[in-house]
A protein has these predicted regions:
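N-terminal Sec/SRP start-transfer signal
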Residues: 1-31, 35, 247
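Hydrophobic, regular-secondary-structure patches
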Residues: 25-100, 123-127, 140, 221, ...
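Peri-transmembrane interface segments
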Residues: 37, 41-44, 216-261
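Short, surface-exposed amphipathic charged segments that create phosphate/polyanion-binding patches used
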Residues: 97-103, 249-253
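Short beta-strand boundary microenvironments
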Residues: 99-142, 146-149
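Basic-flanked hydrophobic alpha-helices used for secretion and membrane insertion
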Residues: 114, 133, 139-237
Length: 261
C-alpha cells in the first residue's frame, strides 16, 4: 500500500509523520487510491457526486463543529438528507495505518451511497452501541468475521478513564468503485459521543445530500454565510472540490503521486 512508502520516507519524524499522513488521509479518503487522487488533476474524478456537500471547520482541518449546526441545515430548501461524522484517531502511527474509525449518523449509507452495507448490519449499527461495520478490504486483510472484537487506542477519552476503545464487528461495507475506501470502520456517532469524556456534542464534518448540484451550491453559500462571524465558521462545497482544496493545503499532491509511478 502507498502508506508504506510514505512511512519509509518519514518514519524518523514520528509526530510530523502522524500529522502529515492524517492530513493526507482525510483528503484522500474521499477518493480511496492514488489513481483517483491523480485523476483530480485531470478532471476525471471517480466515485464522487456533485450533489454531496461537505461542511467542515473553515480554519482548521482537524477542528470541530458543534452538532447544533445541523439545526440550521435542517431548515434549508434543497437538502434531501444529511449525516454527521467524526473521527476516532489512533494515537500510535502503526495502528493509524490499519484504518480509521468513522463515527457517523446511522443513515451514513443512505447519504454516502457509493458505499454499501447489508440491512442487517445497518440495523445493528442503530441498535447495538458497540457495533462496527468494517470495510471489506480491511476485514480481508485482518481476517475479521462477524462477532469479532476490534480494539484501538485513540485520542478520545473513554468513560472508563482510558483511551482504549473496542467494537464488535456487525457486518462489512463495500465501495462501489474504489476499493481503497474499504480501509476503515463505521460506528454510531450517538453512542460514541455519549461514551467519550471530551469534545462531547462536536463533529468533524457534515455531509449533505442535495437535491441537485445547483441546489448544493446555494446550500453551501447559505451555510458559510450563516456561520461566517461565529467561533465555528464553516467551509462548504462539493466533496471533490473540498478534497482538492485540502490536498492543496498540504503539498503538491500531484507531484507526490507521480513520484511513485
Amino acid at each position: 500500500m502507498y502508506w508504506t512508502l510514505v512511512k519509509i520516507g518519514l518514519i524518523r519524524k514520528r509526530l510530523r509523520t502522524f500529522l502529515t499522513i492524517m492530513s493526507m488521509f482525510i483528503a484522500f479518503a474521499l477518493y480511496g487510491t492514488l489513481n483517483t487522487v491523480s485523476s483530480i488533476f485531470t478532471g476525471a474524478i471517480e466515485g464522487t457526486s456533485a450533489e454531496n456537500i461537505i461542511v467542515m471547520p473553515r480554519y482548521d482541518m482537524f477542528g470541530k463543529l458543534p452538532y447544533s449546526h445541523v439545526q440550521f441545515i435542517e431548515t434549508l430548501d434543497g437538502v434531501e438528507d444529511f449525516m454527521v461524522m467524526d473521527y476516532l484517531i489512533s494515537d500510535g502511527l502503526e495502528s493509524m495505518m490499519d484504518g480509521v474509525v468513522y463515527a457517523t449518523s446511522p443513515n451514513f449509507f443512505d447519504v454516502y451511497d457509493r458505499f454499501e452495507a447489508s440491512d442487517e448490519s445497518i440495523l445493528a449499527l442503530k441498535t447495538n452501541p458497540n457495533a462496527a461495520i468494517v470495510g471489506q478490504l480491511m476485514a480481508d486483510q485482518k481476517g475479521l468475521k462477524i462477532g469479532d472484537i476490534i480494539y484501538t487506542k485513540a485520542n478520545s477519552l473513554n468513560t472508563d478513564g482510558s483511551y482504549n476503545w473496542s467494537f464488535e464487528v456487525a457486518g462489512f461495507y463495500t465501495a462501489k468503485q474504489i476499493k481503497g475506501d474499504e480501509m476503515g470502520a463505521v460506528i454510531n456517532w450517538d453512542t460514541f459521543d455519549e461514551a467519550r469524556m471530551n469534545q462531547k456534542g462536536t463533529i468533524g464534518m457534515i455531509m449533505i445530500k442535495a437535491q441537485s448540484a445547483e441546489e448544493g451550491e446555494i446550500i453551501s453559500q447559505k451555510i458559510d454565510e450563516r456561520f461566517m462571524n461565529s467561533s465555528y465558521a464553516t467551509r462548504s462545497g462539493p466533496e471533490s472540490m473540498m478534497a482538492v482544496e485540502m490536498a492543496g493545503e498540504i503539498a503538491d499532491v500531484e507531484l507526490i503521486v507521480n513520484s511513485f509511478w
